[in-house]
Every structure is written in structure tokens, then in C-alpha cells.
Amino acid sequence: MLFRWCPLVALAIASGTAATEQSWESSPYYPSPWTKGEGEWEAAYQKAVSFVSQLTLDEKVNLTTGVGWMQESCVGQVGSIPRLGFRSLCMQDGPLGIRFGTEARMDIFLYLTCNTNFYLPYVGDYVTAFPAGINVAATWSRELAYLRGKAMGEEFRGKGADVILGPAIGPIGRAPEGGRNWEGLGPDPVLAGKLVAETIKGMQKSGVIACAKHFIANEQERFRIAAEAQGYGFDIAESISSNVDDVTMHEIYLWPFADAVKAGVGSIMCSYNQINNSYGCGNSYTQNKLLKGELGFRGFIMSDWQAHHSGVGSAFAGLDMSMPGDTLFGTGVSYWGANLTIAVANGTIPEWRVDDMAVRIMAAYYKVGRDQVQVPINFNSWTTDVEGYQHALVKEGYGVVNQRVNVRDHHAQIARRVARDSTVLLKNKGVLPLTGTEQFTAIIGEDAGPNINGPNSCPDRGCDNGTLAMGWGSGTTNFPYLVTPDDAIQREIVGKGVGNVMSVLQNGDFKNIQAVAGQADVALVFINSDSGEGYISVDGNEGDRKNLTTWKGGDEMVKQVTSVCNNTVLVIHSSGPILAGQWHDNPNITAILWAGLPGQESGNALVDILYGKENPGGKSPFTWGRAAEDYGTTILREPNNGKGAPQHLFSEGIMFEYRHFDQKNITPVYEFGYGLSYTTFSYSDLRVRPMRANKYVPATGMTKPAPRLGHSSTKYADYLFPGGFKGVTKYVYPWLTSTDPKEASGDKNYGMPLEDYVPPNANNGDAQPVLPASGVPGGNPGLFEDLYEVSAVITNDGDRVGEEVPQLVRNLSFFPPILS
């Protein structure tokens, strides 16, 4: 695959052993690897060791444990270390920009907290609403991925956030109905890996820590959280298990994370789902062996919010930070906090494991230069009022919580460029670009116009009202404004002062639709398909899409227009592919554009393409099938294991999406990587040159023993709440309420024999064998050796400036062929 400003790189397609029916269990792997300093991590590691060496046990625990849901300004914060002047680290959503104000995992959060005292503001706080990750994938541009990441990083830094909860590379998009596919970078692991690496570099260049998520095999919303599924009427007690074979894990789901680690990502978020029947944040195989062992990840693993299911077990399994800190939202009870303090004091967890957690957190902090660019936290996730409660959950600490700092700078230009360059021209019978001087232009469809209640009126964008510019869920942000296609197109035409333009912005108003479209020289018809996170249901779509059809009767609206207008231009806003089979080859549809989820600059970016101000250069980041069955994969829609964890077998192995279409010889409507242009390109002088790649050498040897940075007291009395200290209600602290550890822990099972819950070798801090697949951050260096250089002379033969994205698909000869 080629990225616009880079040499050609080949995408290898290989067959692998598919998963088969069996009992799926995740193999244990202990101890949790301790980090070390090397390469670009060396200086940060040394600073981290120096800092952590000064800490008491309770201060180390404070670094690892969130203070509780809605207890501070950010969606997640750990404790502070006042003695050293170290403020609480701020974790903030999300992958499209700074999310706050509506903070609305409402369905599940209100259910769990019984808290109805939420204020739902509808305004943005001087931040940019960027295009979605799937749009970045459609640009195939490392440059734009970097620029978007850097702009985001600058905004988070300006608001005082330390960690961006993004970018997303899980879900990768195994099933086209997946609710959060749009947050990620598409279903090809090479494309996703290259672009996530540049996004991370941009974010961290700005002085904030990127958090790549969701690790791993997190491919659907349904059943991801048992309590959430219960709210939808499913009687299950455990989250879904994604059952994945090792080849598929490495070649598909782990690959983009390898690129993220190689790029120096500071944090990775573990996921809600189980992997081979072990929860993501307590899975020692995926966290200890794959991520910290094979990939050599030097940063810290953070739990998704309430994806933390155990205390001692998750610590041994590699989790480094618990978010938001409480076991259930608003309880003030934590698996860690005081319980982690007790577990170290009584010898259950060796102190070196907590040292390693703290060093990993601080190494990421120093690596991106957080100590050099500190900005006070100047926003609040729970209200956009200037004044409010610092501890919103319990309504304590009233004062100024929002300073309304404008952090946007020139970022609207970057957002517009990404939205524009990600627009994919799927069909053109010579009608595009338009001139703006057409005699009569009709604009048809709700998706062209505004949400009459405002673009932020639905919490976390949990509706499909007006034009679709982002999906829904925690990965959203508030729009500072939203330029609708209707506004931008009308402005373009009226500015020319020649043609008429008329809009009908109700999909079902067939009488007026036909009356207007029947007079038009060109009818611009807008359709969409939305999706999002599982805590919000929109029209029965509980995060994941129910189907791949258009929403709000879009197909029928297209039929109504094309029956009276022979020059219909179709514009699609969607979170993924839709079924285009019934209209893509309609002769009265003269052009089709996919604009994805373009963010705040939606209309402006579209006008740039429609009216030829810029050449369309986007390439489809997914395959467009003729039927849902063409994909060969879908989400699991019904429980299949009684009340236990639904079992989702990834039986296709690596053969999903375009690989499946190729293997099964299924002709799609539009291929992965497809996209037309207003100009033409010719290829010549194609050359393939073998590179002098180094021989693959498995890593060998032993690690050093686990660094021990402190010898803390084992006396429980040393960890009691400080005398005279007045705490915040339901706040998670590292201190004990009693010298009786069972009473202080609140754990009815306290005192169980260690052999009943501490896995063999988990507390072994001796030198350990180096994994053969390891070597440097990202994995064995042999993974990144260039085998061939492919070059060509590409000539623009047309009369317009444009960009081309050459693509090369190579079937490796030592695997069974999958292409005929």
C-alpha cells in the first residue's frame, strides 16, 4: 500500500489456520514483564525511576488508581502526590477531540449509579470536532494522520489533559455492522498500523500521552458489558468472549498495536470483552506475553471504564492503572486503592510489581515532556457552566470549574482538509465537478440539513437528526459549529448569482421531493447510516447496526428522486459500508460520493469536491458488498452460552473483509481501496527490487531481575488515613480505615490461601527468559525489515491537479494461494 508522501510498501495477503470449534481458554503467562530503559525510552525511564524511588507505597498506589467516577474534572483522574508537587493525571476522551459537557453513557451509568442529577449542556467549549478515524483511513495519508493527531494533542494540552483516550484501532472492523468501527482506521491491519503510528506521533509531539485502544479483539458492542446487555433484556452474567486463534491474533488484531508500540505510544487501554474466556484487563496472555513481552511495550496499560474485574489478579495480569477507580460508578469502592496498599503490605503482591506500574506511568509522562508543558486543568466534564462542583458526584467543592479556554487555533483548516481528502468518488458519469451555475439545483434529504434542536442536542450524538457528521458514544465531542451540506451548497450557488436552488429536508415528503427534483438540472440526494457505542440505542440500533441498509427510508427516497430526475448525485454519510446494490448502477444516478463522518467542516469539505475546488483523492477504507452475507462475518446477536459469557468464535481466521471476498471470489460493488478522480493517471517503469534484509534472528537471553525501588513498611498502621484529614465523600484513597486488613479491605474473601488465587510464578521477580518474538518496542526487529522496493513513475495525464494512491497486493508464495 502506498501512503502519499512515502515509498511504496507492499501489503502481504496470506492464508492462515482458521479457528475451529474447541474449548477456548487463554493460556496463563507470568510474571508481568517489568519495563526497562532503551532507545527513545531511556531518558524517560531514568527520570521515572528517580521519581518513583522517592515515593511511599501509598503514593505509588495513588498513581495507579482512579479517584472515582465524576470525582474530578476529567473523565478519569488518578490521585495526586502533594508532597512532591505532582498533580493528579487527567485522562480525557476521545479519538475525535475533547469530549465533555454531555458526558453521557447515560443508559448504563444512570442505571448503575441511580444518579439523575446530570446537567446536559448543548454547547461546545472552544474545541474542534475532527473527522472520524475511518475518514483518516480513507485519505491513506500518513501526513494527514500526523497533522490531525498533532492538532488534537495541542487542544488536549491546552485544556490541561495529560492523556488522550485515543486513537482507536480496536475494533478493527471484523464485522461491517460493528458500532464503533468508525472510530478506528479500517479493517486492514497494515493501513491501520501505519496511520495509528502517525496519529500517535502527532499527539505525543504536542506533549500529551496517547492511549491506543481497545486491546484487543473488541469487535462488537452487543454483550461487551453484561450489565449493559441486561438493560437490553439479555439474561447474561458475563461479557462476550472473542475466541481467536494465535495466527489471527498476531496477523490481524495485534498488528496495528505493534505499530503503535513501535511509534512509542505511552498508554494502551484494555477492553471490556473477554479474549478466549479471560477478561481483557485481566488477561495475562494478551497483556503480559503479547503486549509487554513480545511487543516490548514500555508504557502503561489502563483499564476501560469499569473493565477492571479483580484486584490481585489484574495486577499480576499486567494492568497498571484502574479507571475510573471505583468498582461500580459512584460507590467509592475500589479493587485497588486501599486494597492494593493492603496487598503489598501483606506480601500478596510484591512491591516491585507496583513499582513497575508507577515507573511505566511516569516513563510515559516524561517521554512526551509532560513535565515541560504543564497547563492547569481548565475544563470540566460534567458541566460547561463556569462555576460548578469540583466533585460533581457528591456535590462538594463549589467554585470555578470551567475557564472556557479557546484551544482551536487553525485546526479547522486541518479538519476541513481531512474531511475533503477522505471523500471517495465511487461513481461519476462525467457530471462532476459541478459549476455552481446550473440552472436549478435540488438538495434532497434530512442528511443535508441541520438538527433543528442543534448539533449537540442529543447526548453524545445519540440520534440521527439532520446531517450525520460523527457517530455516537464516548468517542465523540461537542460541535463548536456544524457546517451542513445544505448551508454550504446554497452559499456556493447563491454566490455565483446564476442558478436556483431549492431544498427538501424531510426524507418522507415525497410529494415535494418529486415536485422539486422533477424540475432540477441536478438533484443532490443525501442518505446516511449511523452507529455508535452500546450504552445508547438509536432506533433499535444498540451501538452495532441492525443491518447495512440506509436509515430513515433513504433507499425509497432515492427511488422517488431517480424516477423524476435523470441527473441524480448521491452523497453518503455513513459509519461503514451500506448495501448499494439496488441503486448503484441506476442510470439516473450519475455520481456517488462517500463522505464518511466528516466532523464540523462537513459542508465546506463536500463543496470543495462537488464544485471542483479540489480533486477527490479518497480511497474506500472498506469493501462494499452486494449483500450482508457477502462479508462472511457479522456480530453475535443472541446469547449462546446460557447465562455465561456469549462465545463468539472468529472462525474466519484472517479471512475477513477484502480477504474473504478474494478467497471466495465474490465480486463487490466497490473494492477496498477503490476511488475515482477528476483526473487520470498513468503508470510506467514499474520495478521490483529485492532488498538486503537482515536474517530473522529470534531474541535470546535473560532479562535483569525486577527492579526494586523501595522497601515499604508492612505495618498496616503506617497506611491509615492521616490524622485530621478531611476527605471527599466516596473518593478513592490509598489509605486504610482500620489496622484490621479484612475490615479495611471490605473483601468478604480476605484471608484466602495465596495458592487459591495467586497464579504460579506471578510473584517471581527473578530474571526471566527473553521471548524469541521480542527485541525492541514493536516486536522482533525482523518484523520491520523491508523485503522489496517497488517503484513506478506515476504521471498525471489530466488537466487537474490531483493525488494518486497506488496500491500493491502481494500474495506470499510460501502460503497457500488465496487468489485465483
UniProtKB/Swiss-Prot annotation:
Pfam families, A to Z: Glyco_hydro_3, Glyco_hydro_3_C
Disulfide bridge partners, by residue number: none
GO cellular component: extracellular region
Residues annotated as glycosylated: N62, N276, N339, N346, N465, N547, N566, N588, N811
UniProt keywords, alphabetically: Allergen, Carbohydrate metabolism, Glycoprotein, Glycosidase, Hydrolase, Polysaccharide degradation, Secreted, Signal
EC number of this enzyme: 3.2.1.21
Pathway as given in its UniProt record: Glycan metabolism; cellulose degradation
SUPFAM superfamilies documented for this protein: (Trans)glycosidases (SSF51445), Beta-D-glucan exohydrolase, C-terminal domain (SSF52279)
InterPro entries hit by this protein: Cellulose_deg_GH3, Glyco_hydro_3_AS, Glyco_hydro_3_C, Glyco_hydro_3_C_sf, Glyco_hydro_3_N, Glyco_hydro_3_N_sf, Glycoside_hydrolase_SF
Biological process according to GO: cellulose catabolic process
Cleavable signal peptide: 1-18
EC category: hydrolase
Any GO molecular function: beta-glucosidase activity
UniProt subcellular location: Secreted
Purpose: Beta-glucosidases are one of a number of cellulolytic enzymes involved in the degradation of cellulosic biomass. Catalyzes the last step releasing glucose from the inhibitory cellobiose.
Family, per entry: Belongs to the glycosyl hydrolase 3 family.
UniProt name for this protein: Probable beta-glucosidase ARB_05654
